[in-house]
């Protein structure tokens, strides 16, 4: 008892002391530690994690102890701080208001930790009873070595990966930069400077959390996200999967074994393109929708399984809070959780049809989900006169014209997101189930789970998730109904996110049980018995060796992209982008090509652009117009940008500049357009540090006449 009490006090004392030290670092020693940004990042993350880790320690210790404490604490903190941001966003208050509220929450948590350390008080989740965690007889042991090695490899790849030069991440970072620029949160659209109406941005707490991270740590937003948060999120995602496996399989070794297979899956599928499993994993975790896929979905399933099996209402409370919080991150996360839980609930009730306890627990979770979606579903139509799904689609952070958003997925076959039939119905593209690893794991996992589904909560969760999600996205009438009435067609492929999660976990479980069967039959032979105990680790090592050629092939384009991005000034970025951040102090319009302009608002909250990745629409515009005749709004800014930089007459160019009230034009140095602008009046080169690009200050009153006609004394 004394040892347990001492251990409890030491943990809370460590949290309180580390939190206090972190407060000192970020508040008092920031300038002194500016040369060591990693230290400031660690301090900021310590403050961020403190509330969630303490709550998980105090109330969830039966299932989430040891390494599982970290991802549980992360999801609780991330969800809590996201919900905290919602009223601030709706009120369009400043980031400082949010920071004060978050700071109070952290300070209260640290004070509670200090009091618990001094008094030795126990909480419900720490009661000295034989809980599920005590039933975990198989500790990780040597299995931690390959797991941590694979986690380290993926984190390293995430660290060295250069972001997509044209990806969604730059849109998100533009919003975050706007929050850092002052003023009301979600009050101004970051690309064009317009007002923000009823939009998903008004409830997106994930972006506010990233703004708070940048402000508290003092690290530049872009560098902080790509150099620190991205590899950190990779580690958390793998630990989250481990935590889910640990809850379901009740074995630390089995969970680590499954975690190794999960990590190897991403390593085998590495690639620079973000449309591969591995490329997505190492590049896109800072995006809100990917956070729901890799953090909130598996942790919600873990909380649900713990509640269904043990019946303790604190796990139900965590499940309900995660479901509520995920809406403040990205609504698609709520849809994937709901779909998974529907399958789980149906199978659990089918396996226990006469159990009042089973009915009560499943109905409680279902009611929680219905209440979470019912409130906005009732209020939004009353306020706007439109269904909730239409409002979210019309104002998606990444979208412009909602009709374009609805049809883009059908005209981008290279992304393998959807498969359309001749009658107009559609399903998710079969590429997911045609992946060799997923296909084998799915076909072997289904009969394995069916054999156990009657008596195992884990089998019920995994099989229910796999089966119902497959029906939802691969049965044409069902998928078409969901795409037309519940989510957009372009969201159908995201509804399938639970399939690889559950399939890989089921396959890992199958291999683990196979290994146990082999071990049991070899236990009578001394030498073979010793080898059999190391069998899981040996299997992982063998699979890693076999995967090495695929990993090497996947790393090659990642390295090539990093070097090409460095050479082109995409990442690390050309010095002109930090110049925008440091020198532009009032609202400004910059005319730049789509490729160059995509990053400008991510560096400057005052710099707006003429087009927001408009070439993506223009490239498929004829096909989109064919699908929705008369309903597509042609993005004028995108048309003007393409025409200006493709070569146009002086008159047309002047019209474009005046139409958008352009203040600066950004062109490639020594290009024909650079020479042309230099020969015209009204364009004055700006002194900036870039050698790749030239920035011209535009005088709209004088543009269009030859420079030779200017008086030498004419001011610009």
What are these regions (language model features)?
Residues 44, 231-234, 289-296, 335, ...:
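Hydrophobic/aromatic-rich transmembrane helices and adjacent perimembrane loops
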Residues 1-137, 477-484, 491, 505:
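Membrane-embedded, hydrophobic transmembrane alpha-helices
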Residues 136-139, 252-257, 311-313, 352-364, ...:
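Membrane-interface helix-loop-helix junctions at transmembrane boundaries of multi-pass membrane enzymes
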Residues 245, 345-352, 435-459, 506-517:
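Hydrophobic, aromatic-rich transmembrane alpha-helices
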Residues 33-43, 91-99, 164-165, 272-292, ...:
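Membrane-helix boundary/interfacial segments in multi-pass membrane proteins
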Residues 546-716:
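Extracytoplasmic
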């Amino acid at each position: 008892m004394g040892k347990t009490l001492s251990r409890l006090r030491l943990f809370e004392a460590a949290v309180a002391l580390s939190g206090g030290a972190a407060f000192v670092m970020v508040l008092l020693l920031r300038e002194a530690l500016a040369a060591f940004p990693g230290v400031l990042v660690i301090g900021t993350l310590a403050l961020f994690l403190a509330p969630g880790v303490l709550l998980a320690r105090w109330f969830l210790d039966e299932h989430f102890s040891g390494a599982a404490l970290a991802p549980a604490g992360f999801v609780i903190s991330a969800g809590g701080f996201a919900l905290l941001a919602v009223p601030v966003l709706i009120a369009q208050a400043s980031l400082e208001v949010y920071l004060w509220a978050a700071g109070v929450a952290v300070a209260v948590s640290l004070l509670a930790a200090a009091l618990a350390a001094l008094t030795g008080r126990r909480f419900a989740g720490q009661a000295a009873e034989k809980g599920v965690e005590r039933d975990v007889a198989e500790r990780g042991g040597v299995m931690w070595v390959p797991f941590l090695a694979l986690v380290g490899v993926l984190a390293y790849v995430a660290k060295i990966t250069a972001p997509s030069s044209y990806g969604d991440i730059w849109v998100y970072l533009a919003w975050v930069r706007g929050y850092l620029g002052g003023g009301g949160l979600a009050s101004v659209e970051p690309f064009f400077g317009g007002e923000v109406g009823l939009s998903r941005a008004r409830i997106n707490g994930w972006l506010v959390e990233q703004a708070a991270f940048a402000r508290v740590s003092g690290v530049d937003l872009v560098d902080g996200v790509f150099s620190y948060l991205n590899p950190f999120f990779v580690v958390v995602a793998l630990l989250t999967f481990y935590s889910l496996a640990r809850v379901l399989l009740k074995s630390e070794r089995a969970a680590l074994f499954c975690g190794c297979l999960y990590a190897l899956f991403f390593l085998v599928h590495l690639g620079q393109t973000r449309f591969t499993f591995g490329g997505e994993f190492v590049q896109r975790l800072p995006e809100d929708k990917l956070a729901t896929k890799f953090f909130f979905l598996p942790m919600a399933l873990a909380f649900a399984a713990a509640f269904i099996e043990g019946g303790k209402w604190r796990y139900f409370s965590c499940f309900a809070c995660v479901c509520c919080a995920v809406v403040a991150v990205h609504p698609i996360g709520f849809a994937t959780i709901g779909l998974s839980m529907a399958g789980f609930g149906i199978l659990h009730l089918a396996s226990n049809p006469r159990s009042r306890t089973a009915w009560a627990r499943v109905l409680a979770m279902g009611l929680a989900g219905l209440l979470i979606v019912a409130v906005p579903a009732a209020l939004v139509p009353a306020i706007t006169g439109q269904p909730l799904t239409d409002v979210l689609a019309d104002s998606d952070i990444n979208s412009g014209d909602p009709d374009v958003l609805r049809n883009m997925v059908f005209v981008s076959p290279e992304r393998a997101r959807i498969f359309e039939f001749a009658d107009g119905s559609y399903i998710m593209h079969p590429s997911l189930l045609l992946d060799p690893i997923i296909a084998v794991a799915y076909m072997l996992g289904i009969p394995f789970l069916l054999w156990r589904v009657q008596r195992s909560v884990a089998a019920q969760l995994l099989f229910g998730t796999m089966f119902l999600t497959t029906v939802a996205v691969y049965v044409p009438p069902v998928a078409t109904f969901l795409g037309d009435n519940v989510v957009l067609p372009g969201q159908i492929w995201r509804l399938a996110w639970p399939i690889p999660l559950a399939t890989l976990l089921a396959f890992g479980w199958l291999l683990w049980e196979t290994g146990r069967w082999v071990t049991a039959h070899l236990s009578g032979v001394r030498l073979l018995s010793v080898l059999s105990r190391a069998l899981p680790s040996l299997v992982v090592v063998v699979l890693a060796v076999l995967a090495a050629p695929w990993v090497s092939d996947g790393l090659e384009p990642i390295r090539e992209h990093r070097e090409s991005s460095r050479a082109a000034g995409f990442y690390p970025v050309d010095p002109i982008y930090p110049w925008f951040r440091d020198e532009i102090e009032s609202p400004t319009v910059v005319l730049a090509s789509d490729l160059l302009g995509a990053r400008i608002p991510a560096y400057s909250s005052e710099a707006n652009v003429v087009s927001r990745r408009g070439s993506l629409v223009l490239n498929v515009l004829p096909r989109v117009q064919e699908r929705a005749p008369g309903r597509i709004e042609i993005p004028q800014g995108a048309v003007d940008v393409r025409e200006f930089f493709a070569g146009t007459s002086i008159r047309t160019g002047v019209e474009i500049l005046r139409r958008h009230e352009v203040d600066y034009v950004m062109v490639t140095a020594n290009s024909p357009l650079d020479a042309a602008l230099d020969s015209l009046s009204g364009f004055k080169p700006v002194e900036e540090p870039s050698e790749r690009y030239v920035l011209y200050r535009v005088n709209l009153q004088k543009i269009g006449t030859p420079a030779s006609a200017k008086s030498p004394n004419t001011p610009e």
